Each structure stands twice: as C-alpha cells, then as structure tokens.
Amino acid sequence: MNEDRPSFFLLSLSGGGLLSQPQQAEQILSCNAQTAAYGLSLTPAQALALAKAREETLVKTGRVELDGGILSSLIRAFCDSPYLTQDNYADTLEELVTLFYAFKNETEDRLGDAALIADMKEAFDGPCGGSLELLAGRGLETLQARLGPSGLGWDWEEARTDD
C-alpha cells in the first residue's frame, strides 16, 4: 500500500439503502404471514410503493439506512391496532414511516427505534384514537416530554450534581 496517497473508500447508496426496492418489497411482503391473522396484507404493488415512499422520505429527511429500514418493524408493531383496516393499511403505513423519520429527526435520535415505535403505537392506539394527524402533533409533544424539558434528552451531568 502506498502511504503517500490518502486511502478512502466511497460507498454509493442509491435511494438511501443497500437493498433495492424489489428486495425491500420482498422483505415487506414477508410480514404478510404475521399480519394475515389481523385481516391485513399488502400486495406486491403496495409493498413496492411503500419501499419507494420510504426511500423518498429518507431523502427528504436527510437520513440514510443501510438495511431494509424500519418498515418491517412498523408493520409488526402496528398490525394488531384496532384502527387499521385492509382499506387504510397501506396508506397508514406510509404515513407512519414519514412520522417515524420526522420524530427521529425532531428528537435528534435520542430514542432508539424500538422505543420510538412502541411510543408511537401507544399514542396511536390510545389518546390519538387512530388519528395520524393527532399522532403527528400529540405524538411529538409526548416524545419531547418523555425526553426531558428541552425535548432533547435527560441531562445526566445535571442529574449527578443534584444528588
């Protein structure tokens, strides 16, 4: 290796992830086995549309993911919601993806994916009564309150000095 030249490598990501849209769609469709118990399923066209919407949301929010993303986790978490029907399922999932990434940005990634999804689900099924509009407003307020007065997380240094 020539030490006079800088060494680096460039990873080019197409659409925000390493999986192609068809691969993402297959990953999404694999959730149908679980969601069928709740009368919910996605068609290949809907799964592909969700993969595309996810990529567009990643670009809009300036985020990058190196795997299939959060869609499968959202699907598994929300499939038992009493507010999801076959008629609103795909559209609701698309909006949940948008809200998920917006919440991640607003909370500066201080809440892990699983915890954020659990909070979103609790708010969606609880006080929001299945309303995505309320989730967009109240959900963020609830998350910010949970993360501390500034909405940016607990200040561990301050907590130590209060002893």
Task: Show where each model-derived region lies.
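Short terminal alpha-helical segments
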Residues: 2-56
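Acidic, low-complexity, intrinsically disordered interaction modules
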Residues: 42-159
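Long, low-complexity, intrinsically disordered segments
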Residues: 161-163
